């Protein structure tokens, strides 16, 4: 570096990210990469926020804060907050972060992100994807949860007539039909 007239960089050791108490995360063992997490329906901001907090803790007034914008992470990051002990990757915690980010999105942004997943199950173009997205925003933890939540829009499931019978209320299929009308 000195030969080129460059400043000597400061090297920092970051502890490994572990899959459990005894094993490092590794693609060889099927642990997810960033692309895998994106394909599983996680938002980039949620992944960044979670990974940033794996081996680092903010100091000061934001020491208790979990959800950060990218600009807040950049502003608050300090090498002194890096942990010396390994961090354990918890997919449930990442899912919590992702659900928080999904719910915080503007309705239009959520509708745009959700539309491809809605269209996987709802093939009818007459169905308004943004109206469906408005119903889903508070109910999804990952974008990939959406297709299974909306698959009934195109084809209603077949219900057994016994479903409408209740002995306590003394209803049968005929009475139930009248009540529904």
Language model regions located:
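Alpha-helical recognition segments enriched in aromatics with Gly/Pro capping
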Residues: 1-102, 115-116
């Amino acid at each position: 570096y000195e030969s080129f007239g460059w400043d000597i960089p400061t090297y920092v050791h970051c502890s490994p990210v572990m899959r459990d108490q005894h094993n490092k995360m590794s693609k060889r063992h099927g642990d997810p990469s960033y692309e895998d997490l994106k394909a599983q329906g996680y938002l980039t901001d949620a992944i960044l926020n979670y990974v940033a907090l794996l081996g680092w803790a903010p100091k000061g007034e934001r020491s208790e804060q979990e959800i950060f914008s990218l600009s807040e992470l950049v502003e608050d990051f300090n090498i002194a907050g890096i942990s010396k002990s390994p961090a354990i990757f918890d997919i449930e915690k990442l899912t919590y972060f992702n659900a928080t980010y999904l719910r915080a999105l503007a309705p239009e942004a959520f509708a745009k992100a959700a539309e491809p997943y809605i269209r996987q199950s709802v093939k009818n173009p007459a169905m308004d994807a943004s109206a469906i997205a408005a119903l889903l925003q508070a109910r999804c933890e990952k974008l990939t949860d959406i297709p299974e939540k909306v698959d009934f829009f195109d084809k209603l499931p077949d219900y057994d007539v016994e479903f409408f019978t209740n002995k306590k209320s003394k209803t049968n299929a005929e009475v139930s039909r009248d009540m529904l009308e």
